Amino acid sequence: MDFTNRNTLRDCWIVNDNVMGGLSQSSLREDPQGMFFEGQISRENNGGFASMRSAIRFPQGTQHIELLANGDGKRYKLILRTELAPRVTYAADFVALPSWQTYQFNLGQFKSTFRGRAIDAPTLSFSDVIEIGILISDGQTGSFAIQLQTLQSK
């Protein structure tokens, strides 16, 4: 997935805590170096999260995922959803350092959750993934910004 390509931006969407009455805001912004996911997290009205998402398919045999990103020092989650368990979110934490970094994620790093709580779920396989996203939550408030350049399966 090439986040420097403007067509990628068109295929992404935002899901914030306003789906549950929260007041957090976020947006996606095009940039030649890569797409920005940025906004403001508020815990008012029981809120406290923002996410961007996109449909994706990984090839059979994918062993890990690599994300090239430039961040703000905050904690994010790379989230995956599958066709086998569409209501389950598989999440792997990372701190987005304020310089270009390649973050590598293998299957063992992803924990199954439902609305942020750990649950038992089918075993994750990258070949079952239909949606990917970046989530910021976990009690963090205030402004955030992460720039995404590429996401690759290896």
Give residue spans per PLM region.
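Beta-rich carbohydrate-recognition modules and glycan-binding surfaces
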Residues: 1-154
